[in-house]
Amino acid sequence: MYRKREREFQYPPGIEKIIEDVIGGGTIDRRDLRNALFNGKSLDELPPIVIVVKDPETGLYHVLKTALVSEAAAADATAYKVAKNHLFGVGDFVTIGGALTGASDKITAIDKSNAEFDTITLEATIGAAAKGQVLVQAKDKQVAKAAKLPYDGELVVTMNKVDLTVANQQSGLLVRG
């Protein structure tokens, strides 16, 4: 038997009412988060209310990475300034917005030296981005109007924190609430 000591804290209320959830929850795949770094260290825990998507082949849920654009970028830009605390890493593919109407390309560098924002640099431009838009993880490099999400499964959100130091961590999953 293992004993784990943990400080208790209260998350701000994020789920007021559960209308539909995934019965039995789901297993969160942590392999996609290996290259997500915070203060130079790998992430050891996901907070609640994280978007995950189901891989129909394996049945595992993968985190759908996003980042809020913090400064407008021109149509020919390859560097995008985004808010801190995103989960992107070098090698991930991104597109602008969840409508998947833009192009997608590979992240070649992430500059985290500024205290206010991170700068994500891509191999080629994915188009103009307005402040407040969201960079969304994509499957691979695509031209405009051809970007795809990494998996074709249902999008849900986690209902509790997920310990990433443990393989095959379970989580309650909210479909509608």
Stretches found by the model and what they are:
Residues 1-177:
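Surface-exposed, low-hydrophobicity beta-strand/loop segments enriched in small/polar/acidic residues
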